[in-house]
């Protein structure tokens, strides 16, 4: 085995034959790489790629070039034509091709000869497209039909890019013709007629020809303008008629420009926000909602409402509601559960130290079930409306309050009858002897009211009254005692008026629009009562009105004990037969 000692910038080392061969190859390769090349350097593998700038990301260059290449000439031409108001139309032309050989298929027998060849190579097909834009034509060629379109669009772009953009002007108060390219002639006729307030009428004037080849003539009239159109169908004839009359409508003078006045929207002023726990908060708010909001602001349990009792006659129910807030409880009464619940909430607000909200006239006064504020000394006289038998709804109202009773809230006045306010009562002839100029009247006698109520109840339920018979026997001048029960309410009321010494007066009205009689009754008791009845005849009207008065008189003792009434004006109820 031969050994060679090689020294290359390193200490000498003994190498074997195979190691010498590898070492020689490595030494020979090092000088070659360091020798500069005098000839032109060959292109590297990445020579064809663009040199990227380190400052710009490669993705931006790629996206910019891709975006530039994605916009084809046809897309650019479409955008330019929209600005110019022109429509490009592409028309394909038959591609050009030379005559080709039959490829030896013309041999008889249909067999190929032993030697066959193509006489010449087949040239590629060239597609042609003709582009027309606004009267100008451009021809494009390409290997594909799309390439031919791009060629024609590129030629059109070179010429159309130099044309100025047209100014959009309104013609005859209408949109320009370019804007109406996508609108049918019939739509344009209706638009012009609508702006000029002209009537439009399409009518088929005549039709001719055999059933399978009919010809229609349609006549259109737009105000004073008339046009006719002919076609093989009604639709085509209607369109042609619209085209004919549209030419006349375009000659009309332009409409005057009218400036529309923009409506002024008044901004609502923001109310002053008060804390929900302050006593002044909630003036005018429903007491039920106000009480719930106060409890929510305090972060306490919401109020609990409970129905305690129901009392009174079926038509004169009185409900008692109880509300509980923490350790406090309050009650409220009313003709229905809603009113009782509201009154209970008001009483609870007073217990908690909040001001009771003033009643808002959300409903007509005669139908309102709420009371006006409590009268203060020196403020003058107050009038509050309430229902008969409703009692003291608030439980905290002053006993000196004066009340006036309208007709029942769940009933309505018939046609021709006015509410019994003092002025109306005076107009229909109600006795005004009890009303002085200062609207004062002596308070009713509670004992007499109790006797009257007792007699009325006896007459209502039995037809006879032992109490009245005893009074008549003691008072010789009062009259005779009737024999047998009284069945009609009018007779019972007449008998009661003779016993107690008050007057009853009936006033009859003509038939209303429902062919019914209406009668008005005036009772001069203390307090005076007014009612009316409706029926098929006068007698039934009198009975119904008298029945209402008797029912009120039967409850006088309850009203006198629960709530004294010293106010002016008669009490009024209504009834229907």
UniProtKB/Swiss-Prot annotation:
Q: Which CDD domains match?
A: DSRM_STAU1_rpt2, DSRM_STAU1_rpt3, DSRM_STAU1_rpt4, DSRM_STAU1_rpt5
Tissue and organ distribution: Widely expressed. Expressed in brain, pancreas, heart, skeletal muscles, liver, lung, kidney and placenta.
Q: Which GO terms describe its biological process?
A: anterograde dendritic transport of messenger ribonucleoprotein complex; cellular response to oxidative stress; germ cell development; intracellular mRNA localization; lncRNA-mediated post-transcriptional gene silencing; modification of postsynaptic structure; positive regulation by virus of viral protein levels in host cell; positive regulation of long-term synaptic potentiation
Q: Where is this region: Disordered?
A: 34-55, 360-397
Q: This protein's superkingdom?
A: Eukaryota
Domain (DRBM) ranges:
72-162, 184-251, 286-354
> What quaternary arrangement does the UniProt entry report?
Binds tubulin. Binds with low affinity single-stranded RNA or DNA homopolymers. Interacts with CASC3 in an RNA-dependent manner. Identified in a mRNP complex, at least composed of DHX9, DDX3X, ELAVL1, HNRNPU, IGF2BP1, ILF3, PABPC1, PCBP2, PTBP2, STAU1, STAU2, SYNCRIP and YBX1.
Give the comment on domains. One of the DRDB could be involved in RER binding.
What name does UniProt use for this protein?
Double-stranded RNA-binding protein Staufen homolog 1
